[in-house]
């Protein structure tokens, strides 16, 4: 298991990636499906909540559960991105990067 402080540091980087993904979605404007927009908004909102939870979490199970929830939202965003077909390449890259970072963190915690 990674140390709680190491998880928090990694999460700070992931949160920046999620924020960049959200900004890319906004820049893409009307060219983004509602499904993808909703997935990105949920992930962005949940990451803000998760930051607070991770700051307070002391036990490994709470940290793991928080990361698992985020990774599941990352899966949903990736799936929505794939269903969207022809979307902005920068947005697609941001979604895939956020998904990959969340997946890596999850696997390191299990």
Regions found by a protein language model. Name each.
Residues 10-21, 39-46, 69, 73-76, ...:
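Amphipathic, well-ordered alpha-helical segments in soluble domains
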Residues 76-110:
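Amphipathic alpha-helical binding modules
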Residues 25-72:
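Amphipathic alpha-helical interaction modules
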Residues 2, 27-34, 57-61, 79-89, ...:
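Surface-exposed, polar/charged faces of alpha-helical domains
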């Amino acid at each position: 298991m990674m140390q709680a402080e190491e998880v928090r540091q990694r999460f700070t980087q992931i949160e920046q990636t999620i924020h960049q993904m959200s900004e890319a979605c906004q820049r893409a404007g009307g060219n983004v499906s509602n499904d993808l927009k909703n997935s990105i908004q949920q992930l962005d909102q949940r990451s803000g909540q998760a930051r607070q939870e991770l700051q307070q979490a002391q036990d490994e199970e709470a940290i793991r559960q928080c990361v698992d929830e985020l990774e599941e939202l990352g899966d949903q965003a990736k799936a929505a991105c794939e269903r969207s077909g022809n979307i902005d390449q920068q947005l697609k890259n941001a979604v895939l990067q956020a998904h990959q970072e969340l997946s890596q963190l999850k696997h390191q915690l299990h």
